[in-house]
Structure formats: C-alpha cells, structure tokens
Amino acid sequence: MIQPKEYFERFIAWKRHPDPKSPKVTYESYSAMDLNMLTHEMDFGIPGALEELGERYLFGLGLSTDVDKALELFQQAADAGHPDAYHMLADVYRTDQHGRQDLDRYFKLLPSAAERGSWKSMFNLACAYYRGKLGYDGHGYNLDHAAALEWSLKSAEMSRALLEIFFARPCTQDLRDYFGDVYDTFVRAVYSAAKQYMDGDGTEKNPDKARELLTSAQEFHKTHLHSECPQFAALLKKLAENG
C-alpha cells in the first residue's frame, strides 16, 4: 500500500514558490490551478493534474460535463498510482448523480481503491461490510463486521498520517478544504472502530483497545486542533462510567 508521504507529495499537493528569491515553498491543491496550467501539467502526465481535470469534467467545473472524458482521465491518474483516482473510478457508479449508477460495478471496484490507499474508499468499504447486502438492496458484500473493523482501522491510520503531514507543512486554503474531508473521515473511522471494540461487535469485547485508540486520537486532536473532539470525548466518558 502507498506510503502517506508519497500520497501527499506526489498526488495530493504540488509546491508553489511564492517568492522566487526564497527557497521556501507552500503546498497547494491542484484545484487551485487554472485550466491552462492544469492542461499543461496534464500533458506531462502529472497524476494530480489528471485527477483534478477528471473532476472538473465530471462535475462541470468550468468545463462542459463529460463523464466519459472524466473516467478516461481518472484511469490515467489511477494507472500512475493516484489513490483518489481509484476512488473516483468506483464512486462514479455509487449513485445516479452522474447518470451511471451501477452498484455491482461500484462494489467490484471499491476494494481495489481501498487497497491502493484511498482513505475515503477504505472507510466506504468498512461501511459496506458493516451494512452488508441488506443495506444496499441486495448489492455489495455479505455482512462482515470483522472486515468492517479492519478497514475502519486502516482508514483511521491513513487519514491520521496524512493529517500529520498536512499540519507539518505550510498549506494553502484550497488544500485545507481537502483535508477537512480527511479530518471528517478520520473522526468517523476512529469512532466506528472504538465502538466496535467497546461493544464486542465483529471482535472480542475489548474496552482497553477502545480506550487506547480513543486516547491516542484525542491527544492528536488536542495537539493539532487545540481542542477535544466531542465524539471521542463521549466514548471515553462512557468507558470511564463502565469502569
């Protein structure tokens, strides 16, 4: 699986030099590139540019909506190893938003996106295993709460590692918007995994593991966001009350 540092530096962000006379850089999102710059980077096969241009075609952001073109660009970015492109190749088929809903195809592609390192696909896969086929009108996977726990933990690990890199680098607002989604998934993944440990759901009941997971995540939250996460605090309080 991809390492978080490569994920961040090769696929999520690019380096902007605000001052040509200074070696200092700011990390920027590909979404900040104008169309000319994005097309130029795409011509050189830059995965982040390919993925971003795919999203612009998919959602009609400054371009005419073209789902086929979007899929072509996502595939090129995925071939270069971009985890988010793998996620998009699956997610296009999750709903009818783009006129391509095909849940069987979505669930066929989702594990590959998760295995390639997509933090979002990892958690979506956890949810799919937790809900089972009944949660998706007969589509998807057999109920498997143990697998759900495994993928929630992997999503929490990847999203936390990416957040650590983000907090350590000078980043622009556009990149902060992306990492807002990473943060939300981190909280949901930690909460879900801790709850399963607390309830013995898909695993042996293990309040110590739940407490360890939540305490570590809460300390991370305090260090970087200077506040407690209310979701983590609620579960830690429940653990304390139950002894």
List the model feature ranges, each with a label.
Residues 10-14, 50-59, 88-95, 124-136, ...:
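Hydrophobic face of amphipathic alpha-helices that form TPR/SEL1-like repeat modules
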Residues 144-161, 208-223:
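TPR/TPR-like (Sel1-like) alpha-helical repeat modules
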Residues 18, 43-46, 59-61, 80-83, ...:
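Short helix-capping/linker turns of helical repeat alpha-solenoids
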Residues 24-33, 66-67, 100-103, 142-145, ...:
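Helix-turn-helix repeat elements of alpha-solenoid scaffolds
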Residues 49, 85, 121, 182, ...:
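The tetratricopeptide repeat
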Residues 162-182:
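Acidic, Ser/Thr- and Gly/Pro-rich intrinsically disordered linkers and low-complexity segments
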